[in-house]
Amino acid sequence: MAEERKPDEILNAILAGSEDKSIPELLKEMPNEKLIKSFYYMESIPEVTQMRVLQDILKSAQNSEFGKKMGFAELKSVDDFRNKLPISDYSQVEAEIEKLKAGTGDILFDGATASFIATSGSTGIPKLIPESKNGQLVKGLVSQIRAILLLMLAPEVMAAGKKVLAIANPSEYGRTAGGIAIGSASGQAAKDMPTEMLKKMVLPPAMMMAKEVSNEATDYLTIRYALAEKNLVGVVCSNIAHFNILLKKMNAQAAELLADIRTGQISASITIDPSLREKLVSELVADPERAAELETILENKKTLDVAAIWPDFAVVSCWMSASAAKIVADIKKQLPQTVKFLEWGYGASEGKFNIPDKAQDPAGLPALFGYFFEFLPVGATHNQTVLVHELEKGCYYELIITSYSGLYRYNMKDIVYVTEINNQLPRLVFVCKESEKLQVQQLQLRVYEIDGAIQTISDRLNHEIRFYQVLLDQENNKLIFMLEPYSERFDSDSFRVSLEQHLAEINPSYQQLRVAQQLWPAELIVVRDGYRDSLFTRSIMPGKNVNQTKLKTIVSEYPDSSSIVDWAKEGEK
């Protein structure tokens, strides 16, 4: 495609700088084909693109309160920028964000705040991330490019009559005291879908945009619409665990669902707003033929099997990296082998940072046109960052972003891994939060190191693991690994011994603490089948759902006794 990626007049304007339009505004004007060509061309010259994006971001905020304070108009180089502004986090912009929430403009960027995005609230108190007009455009463009590339990788989605199930969160939760909308990152992504994709959605707009619907009702309605549609070709969501749970609920509630499909109704047992119920039911059609077909499948197979109920099911787009990788591996066992898995894309409330363009690959190209990226090598004892074109393959970095929405040298406290580099352009994958690590004196084990160790032993002993968590019992100075294996024949003693030996081999600090008896032998708890899925329903924060829920890998509590199948300890059989 090199011939197709040459710059044209608009790209020259982007690279030279436009007096009256930002880079996101120029890109938004492009038709899909030109947008994709422009995206790939800008990716091919990462150093030039990133310099232009930084200049454009600073220009769009130079008249703001913060921009004047920091002298954005005088910053002429990357070094000027890095020398002037320290690396920051949410606490350092919280006061400015409070002003933005009240409706005050020209604080962190020029103009008014377009919206706020609520974080997942893992601490119990969601943070609100401001969004400028340009910041909204960037997220919309990333979603647009992701959708276009998804369709290029899975053209069967656009076949006539085929439908897609998109599991998203509400695009708007409420408003701030200043009257500014508060939404979710995945809900906004659903709004940003291209029109041709929205027409493919199996869920009606009235349901996708509905507010204050319980998780139970949302799940039932999602299954009800999906099950009624024989031509479902794929599912798009962030957390594939949600789809996995929906499949289980589908079988548990089969009789009720089939009755609704047969009569064109919504069960009276499902509590929803009467006006929403009336709106949805008015558009439903009784389908006794589909109900009979599903009844036959259920009778013959004793389950509503994906391949049988949706014969054309071919595509899943979801998170595939970090803790989601094992969930993807699990659900693949329930789907036809021909199903393509496409990465949903790495992002957060603060931004959408990469654009996947390969099937079965969790990594993606950095969204160079929308953010200025810096990277802090993991383990560095200094704050000296490297830029996109300076990254090294096989290395781990903390991600530092500068955005059009008022985040400057903002530490995402995310760790990303460089899977490959092609002509200075890296492919990045999210691996864990910086805080996800175990520390005992001089020992430090990050989640990706623990995951690698468990995977190594799993492969060596041919014991596949569906899910795991680990805790540090500080009172007794020992690591406790909690594993949910696939097989009932799992040998917990041999797995524990092999894991203990492997940790000592790969981490000298672990070996030293064990020899000095400052850390006692690791223990392994085998938890019952279905433990992971039960955690999802128990871990949902108020106002959230499974799609927005991530399970912690490092925990502080033992599982309840009813969940424990076996407990392997040194010297015990």
Predicted regions and their residues:
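Conserved adenylation A10 loop of the ANL superfamily
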Residues: 116-130, 246
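Active-site diphosphate/adenylate-binding microenvironment
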Residues: 52-56, 60-116, 131, 138, ...
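Mid-sequence acidic-hydrophobic segments that form the walls
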Residues: 122, 149, 249, 253
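Short acidic, glycine/Ser/Thr-rich loop/turn "cap" segments at secondary-structure junctions
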Residues: 101-105, 125-133, 204-207, 228
